[in-house]
Amino acid sequence: SQEPVSTWAVTKDVTFSLFQDTYPEKTEKLTMVMENRGDKEQTLYYMVEGWKGDIPASAGYFHAFYRQEHPVQKGRAYTVVDGLEGKGQFVGLCFAAGMNGHNTCWVEGEPKMYIDGGQHPTINYTGTEDYFCGSYGFGNDILQKQYQTFSGLYAGLYAITGNDSSEMYNGQQRFLLYRFHIQDPVYFSKSFRMTMDNLGWTGPRYDDYTSVAYWYLERPGALPAPLPADGELVMR
């Protein structure tokens, strides 16, 4: 598939913008749906821009998939995406981690990618924060007792909500992150799946994990699973 371009712009609480390569001409139409799954009326406005031109023969079909586990089953890895079949490219993900434990780091788990049916991970990252281009607990300053958020073009820990960051690992915090594989593309020929451990210094944890994964396939594919029920579709 063609090298993708993916850029997000988020204004706190009110605006979500996405700039993404898609090719509706390959299917003659592009349908976008905004569904209100709550019990109150909401105000929505939108604008869609596009460019029409020649489509590369190698251009893939864009896919996105939402998944959550609230909480992650203790001792079992969180599945970011699985069941992808065919030839394609994994683009990246947006990720949220909500703390349910205390007095321990949550980033000791290893993100793992299994490409083309391998029983062992083809790519095994050294830790959760390392995958999101951080290190050492996202630069948690022991003296200042404060996390260091950052926002880059391809990766970032752009926000921390919940208790004040001076609580360090003891607070009920929510970490919001993203990672896009543009400079380090991830290709697959037959299949792809990705998992992420939920581990701390003292062992397995039971935090709330939420993610949206993005990928391209050479032909349209079914999503791995349906969305959660309305009552479960909540960021805790």
Region roles according to the model:
Residues 1-236:
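Beta-strand-centric surfaces of beta-sandwich/beta-rich domains
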